[in-house]
Amino acid sequence: EITTRLVGSEMCIRDRYGFTTGSCAAAAAKAAAYMLLTGKIKNCITIETPKGIPYTAEVTDIVRGESQVSCAVVKDGGDDPDVTSGSKICATVTADNRGDGEKELLQIDGGKGVGRVTRPGLDQPVGNAAINHVPREMITREVQEVCRICDFHGTLHILISVPDGEALAERTFNPRLGIVGGISILGTTGIVEPMSSQALKETIRVELRQQRAEGQTIAAVSPGNYGLDFMQQTYGYDLDRSVKCSNFIGETIDMAAELGFCAMLLTGHIGKLIKVAGGIMNTHSHEGDCRMELLAAAGIRENVSLECLKKILDCVTTEEALAFIDAEGKKEDIMEDIMEKIDFYLKKRAAGRLQIECIVYSNTYGLLGMTAKAEELLRRLL
């Protein structure tokens, strides 16, 4: 799907969308459940993505048994292919008549080629298949729809697998994150939006210009969906008045200043914004990753024990590192140090052209820190 959006007098063109591994898993699971419960072949299937964009997928590799059906959907990365593009995302659905007779029971797990979580701090607990919560919700919703249509009230076991997942995982961050044996089934919106740097930056500029044209003088900016969700859920902020800047924090500051905003409020997860404390203004992992080193440096300044510092440096996620810091009773001290560094580098980039403030949060601990005048700026936004 190619999308075109008119903003003011400018046309913002995005290339062809792709669909996430989560969407593929949900489509394959829905198709397998449908074929199992109806006895009919299904060569294509449509699901609704969280983004609201329908996804119609071709169903391949169909194998039917008396109480089990498996099939596959080929991952289409659109115009932003990644290592999983072209891979088969498979689902095997097995029926079990046990249940309460009133409501179906769905059990979701990962099979061959789907990673298994071995370290804390990720979307799923240790021991679970690396099928993130949004794909699990998508699979559940789509299969429940089939159960309702077919008036099925038993148990369905849903196994997601990726035949080449183990090999693909070696080309991802999964081994370092402590996800072993395969890839992760991911996606928060269900779609893959084209990620060419120039296209993204043009989109950011157009959206900022639109906000400015509508009279906004303070730019509310977040690197991604999670930051925007935090703003909405914590402060009730209208997402339509927010701009997603991806990894381009420095350039977004420049754009906001050029377009005449008097201030900008940046809200994001510690895992992304910790990099700003080191003066990194493009937070993509390809540009550099010193998250644990920055946390450890703050720990040294705040007299954290050597044992804790070693644990921080061995962590793969900031959530995991925060748990060690919190256990030492140093979370507030370290976050105060980190926020001072973030404040310094943001103001250095802004160079007096606009006021800039920042809010940092964690999935586990919620609000972690604010720069000195962030709360005041937030009140003006609300």
Give a label for each model feature.
Residues 16-53, 60-75, 79-85, 91-262, ...:
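N-terminal loops that bind phosphate or other acidic moieties
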Residues 1-8, 13:
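Single conserved hydrophobic/aromatic residue that forms the stacking wall/gate
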